[in-house]
Amino acid sequence: MEIKGLRKIEPYVAGSQPAEKNIIKLNTNENAYGPSPAVHQALASFDAHQLRKYSTLDQTALRQALSDQLGVPTDQFIIGNGSDDILSMAFLAFFNSEEKIIFPDLTYGFYKVWADLYRIPFREVPLTSSFEIDTQDYLVENGGIILTNPNAPTGIYKPLDQVEEIVKANQSVVVIIDESYINFGGETALPLLEKYDNVFITRTFSKDASLAGLRVGYGIGSPKLMAVINAVKNSVNPYNVDSIAEALGTAAVRSWDYYEDICAKIMATRDWFSQELQAIGFDVLPSKTNFVLVKPYGVTAGQLFAYLQSKKIYVRYFPKVERISDRLRISIGTQDEMERVLMTIQELQA
């Protein structure tokens, strides 16, 4: 018998997590360098007896650490179980079922999923032929805007003055700026918080802070926005961040010098790798992230993807996404790893 009322949902397709050992994993934009020594120490010294109790409701220690680091009052932060948790709540808090929200046609795939799930109408705005966000496309009537900056999967960064132009022209709706990759060479939109109360910024600990397996993220916004999204949080899952995540996230923020150093290494390797690929004919989009989106030379994206995988090198291929089906997204690992990737590519070209 048919069961009534079941939702038809097209889910987000996450990158694979191979169980093999001795691989080079460059398909989900993780950080190859690992957490700081302070995080290791915080994990080793965590009192497991604390786990008998629920976690804190407001993650005071982590919010204070972030406030000290970024110079934003503690009451303008909300902590989540990864930035996906924050973004999901933001869709519920800031958008409605009457007005279309807008976001790029090539961006984080979850935006479309959340819009469908929460029955929020949306319009995907095509990137330019050079895969950039055209400011003029966002100076139109809408019910909200979501921009990933730098963007994914392109890696392209939109300068802050252009982002501000979009924010300034849309002060009657919320503009979400997903800064998952901001610490790989971009300029943060945090200064806009002092000028506009419709800006909501999200960040994750999964990329720069090497804590993808922990699931910690946060949002930053005006008191007006925080009141609404906190109401959503407390209506859905008040205890959304576990005690270990708060302790280790706090340790990461308090040891941020370590992460600045490894981000600098990743950026240097990214720029070197991009130049080397261009030298052998690849088209490489300019990146301010911990990955590059490349169009191979001499072989198809599918052929290169299969060859790399046969050598236990995992990258991301988007065969069903028409505009980038001829490209691969390659996360930036250590210098040694990327040298091995380059050698493997050259082997196929030979």
UniProtKB/Swiss-Prot annotation:
Signal sequence interval, chain numbering: none
Pathway assigned to this chain's UniProt record: Amino-acid biosynthesis; L-histidine biosynthesis; L-histidine from 5-phospho-alpha-D-ribose 1-diphosphate: step 7/9
E.C. number(s) listed in UniProt: 2.6.1.9
Keyword Transferase part of the UniProt annotation: yes
Keywords attached to this entry: Amino-acid biosynthesis, Aminotransferase, Histidine biosynthesis, Pyridoxal phosphate, Transferase
Catalytic activity: L-histidinol phosphate + 2-oxoglutarate = 3-(imidazol-4-yl)-2-oxopropyl phosphate + L-glutamate
InterPro entries (UniProt xref): Aminotransferase_I/II_large (IPR004839), HisP_aminotrans (IPR005861), HistidinolP_aminotransfase (IPR050106), PyrdxlP-dep_Trfase (IPR015424), PyrdxlP-dep_Trfase_major (IPR015421), PyrdxlP-dep_Trfase_small (IPR015422)
Residue numbers carrying N6-(pyridoxal phosphate)lysine: K207
CDD domains reported for this sequence: AAT_like (cd00609)
Pfam families: Aminotran_1_2
Domain of life: Bacteria
Cofactor: pyridoxal 5'-phosphate
GO molecular function: histidinol-phosphate transaminase activity; pyridoxal phosphate binding
GO biological processes: L-histidine biosynthetic process
Keyword Transmembrane helix listed: no
Family: Belongs to the class-II pyridoxal-phosphate-dependent aminotransferase family. Histidinol-phosphate aminotransferase subfamily.
The protein's assembly and partners: Homodimer.
Record NCBIfam families: hisC
Protein name: Histidinol-phosphate aminotransferase
Gene symbol of the encoding locus: hisC
